[in-house]
Regions:
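Loop/helix patches that line or flank the sugar-binding groove of alpha-linked glycan CAZymes
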Residues: 34, 331, 343-484
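Beta-strand-rich binding/interaction modules
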Residues: 482-503
């Protein structure tokens, strides 16, 4: 028996998303209050300078909220995101802030707690869920806990409670898979797998867990919507079982305060390992990211669209075995990776955006990705800073690149926010349209996949996505050629005849025959 779907075509052209159309496309936001969002990762120190000192801060971020989400979903001039991930904001000794000195503070470079509260309150008013980076695998070596612990060791005061806050051992107790550093000439060593200035906390210590509970409560009580968990697989190095147990404990504590908090972990590993972590937390999908990931490979024509769709379906099946409510978290790049515009050229940046922004779950956009910012590691040390360059606003914002930057700014050839807002076919306008389509069609983020097998096609593929008895079809053409395809050869679903659209890249549906222009994705409803 054939299912008859009421199908209307919402097309996302990769060259001209702002073109006039003969009929109105329904892009009215369908707001559902749940955990599904479009997130935007921000390195506060490089985003926007609100006081003129060259450093990004919360005053600057507050001033840029209209760019991200102006609070009026019908106005349509903002990016349209409804989630923000803030990289570490607590007092630290480094530019990147992953070495926390005080867990209940705002780093002085970013302003005051009052500045943060003002930003957070306004973001919440606009329906933006703000999650913050939580770095609890390790602290700074300048944290008062560690200072107390090392002073106690040097004074042979081994019963001091802070000694047991950290993983501190004698020579004969050192494990070969871990990195250690001696405390003076004491014969005692602390674990520091990331850096000698980042000593590892001892999560077997009940006092440490009590401290973590207080940290969780402090930020959730302020109105933070959840956490991004840094180094989630390193709490117990090379021990997935104990890590999952720890994060289950953590989530129990989170839910005591905020049942709907969104928590996503950094587990940079294969899907077989990530599957286990989904028993406790949501995780980022690293297999989709970077130059060799599924998104870039599909956009650049290294693998077929059909293979990409098969991967999405298989990955979702894997994580949903661990947790029926598991949420996919796709992304192209983040602060630890070379920026995508370095390996995705021209239209391929838009193709890649379509692939992950039209997938299920919560996509994460790395700040500047929507304007094609570039940045990659250099030859010298400390060049992760090149991946965290100052946002290119194109106005009087004085925010500067972080310390350690060696990137040649002349390589930034894709323009600024200001220039792209003026250009109707810009990458920024493309992202704006994509997010509108996501917000108007809840089936995209929340739907259950039914893959359609296009195994005889390479540059064309797609699937059905069903949510609350409403089904949409999502199809991609990643090639430079127009493709005409009879959908009835691949699926028993029937689609309504489609009105034509005006634009440089037009998509047409004639009966069951779909004609889709180059570098175009369509949503059928």
């Amino acid at each position: 028996m054939k299912k008859i779907l009421n199908m209307s075509l919402l097309f996302l052209t990769l060259i001209n998303l702002g073109a006039c159309q003969k009929q109105d496309i329904n892009l009215e936001p369908n707001i559902i209050k749940d955990q599904y969002r479009t997130y935007y990762e921000i390195f506060v120190g490089a985003f926007s300078d609100g006081n003129g000192d060259g450093l990004g801060d919360f005053k600057g971020l507050y001033n840029r909220l209209d760019y991200l989400n102006d609070g009026n979903p019908n106005k349509g001039k903002d990016l349209g995101i409804d989630g923000i991930w803030l990289m570490p904001i607590m007092q630290a000794n480094s530019y990147h802030k992953y070495d926390v000195m005080d867990y209940c503070s705002i780093d002085k470079d970013y302003g005051t707690m009052e500045d943060f509260d003002k930003f957070l309150n306004e973001a919440n008013k606009r329906g933006i869920n703000v999650i913050i980076d939580l770095v609890i695998n390790h602290t700074s070596n300048l944290h008062p806990w560690f200072k107390e612990a090392t002073n106690a060791i040097l004074e042979a005061d081994y019963n001091n409670k802070y000694v047991n806050y950290y993983s501190i051992v004698k020579e004969e107790e050192k494990e070969t898979n871990k990195k250690y550093y001696e405390i003076g000439s004491s014969g005692y060593y602390y674990e520091g797998n990331f850096s000698p200035v980042m000593p590892e906390l001892n999560m077997d210590n009940k006092d440490v867990k009590e401290e973590i509970k207080e940290i969780i409560k402090f930020w959730l009580d302020k109105g933070v919507g959840g956490f991004r968990l840094d180094a989630a697989k390193f709490v117990y190095l090379d021990d997935t079982k104990r890590n999952v147990e720890f994060w289950n404990w953590f989530m129990d504590e989170v839910r005591k305060i905020k049942k709907d908090a969104y928590v996503v972990g950094e587990v940079w590993n294969a899907s077989t390992v990530i599957e286990e972590y989904y028993q406790a937390i949501n995780c980022f999908d690293f297999d989709m990211s970077q130059n060799g990931g599924k998104i870039a490979y599909t956009a650049n024509g290294n693998i077929s669209v059909n293979e990409y769709v098969e991967y999405l379906n298989e990955y979702r099946n894997i994580i949903e075995k661990s947790n029926p409510n598991a949420i996919l978290n796709p992304f192209i790049s983040n602060h630890d990776m070379n920026r995508a515009a370095g390996y995705l050229k021209d239209e391929k940046m838009k193709v890649a955006a379509n692939l992950y922004m039209l997938s299920s779950g919560n996509p994460f956009i790395y700040y500047g990705e929507e304007i094609g910012m570039k940045g990659s590691r250099g030859i010298s040390d400390n060049t992760d800073a090149n991946r965290r360059l100052a946002m290119l606003w194109g106005d009087r914002d004085k925010v500067k690149d972080p310390e350690g930057t060696t990137y040649d700014s002349s390589l930034q050839t894709n323009g600024t926010v200001k220039s792209q807002l003026r250009k109707k076919d810009s990458l920024l306008k493309h992202y704006q349209k994509l997010i509108k389509v996501r917000n108007a069609n809840p089936e995209i983020a929340r739907g259950k996949y039914t893959p359609i097998n296009f195994e005889d096609q390479f540059y064309f593929g797609g699937y059905l996505s069903t949510y609350n008895d409403s089904t949409i079809g999502i199809f991609h053409n990643t090639s430079k050629e127009e493709i005409t395809i009879d959908l009835s050869k691949y699926t028993t679903y029937q689609f309504e005849k489609l009105r034509s659209f005006i634009g440089e890249n037009e998509a047409k549906l004639n009966g069951q025959i779909l004609t889709i222009e180059p570098y175009t994705s369509v949503v059928l409803k």
